[in-house]
């Protein structure tokens, strides 16, 4: 069972995907002071992976970030997740090493 981030829920920043009345996945969009937004997720229940839920959550997150007037949406992707983000229109900007291992900082431009 997924644990949804209570502070982000209270701030209205969480998008939840329901499947048969249960939370099957979620994504968080956090606006930044520099006019960009950070994408946290998507997180999808493992038994529902590869069913399009992650893509739907990212599409909703893009629309939400645009409604917040963010010019760019940023995501941190593990090597395994990087192809998924590329399919969602993100491009790698740089590689960094975190306590969880290497990640690609990826960007999707929202406003021309």
Give short role names for the model-derived ranges.
Residues 1-40, 45, 58-59:
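Acetyl-CoA-dependent GNAT
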Residues 26, 51-58, 104-111:
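Accessory recognition modules or surfaces
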Residues 26, 48, 84-85, 90:
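Conserved hydrophobic/aromatic "anchor" residues
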Residues 32-34, 47, 80-82, 111:
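Short coil/turn motifs at secondary-structure junctions
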Residues 44, 50-63, 87:
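Conserved acetyl-CoA-binding loop-helix of GNAT-fold acetyltransferases
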Residues 54, 58, 79-83, 97-104:
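Short glycine/proline-centered loop/turn elements that form peptide/ligand docking sites
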Residues 65-78:
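Conserved GNAT acetyl-CoA-binding A-motif
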Residues 74-76, 91-108:
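Conserved catalytic-core motifs of GNAT/GCN5-like acyltransferases
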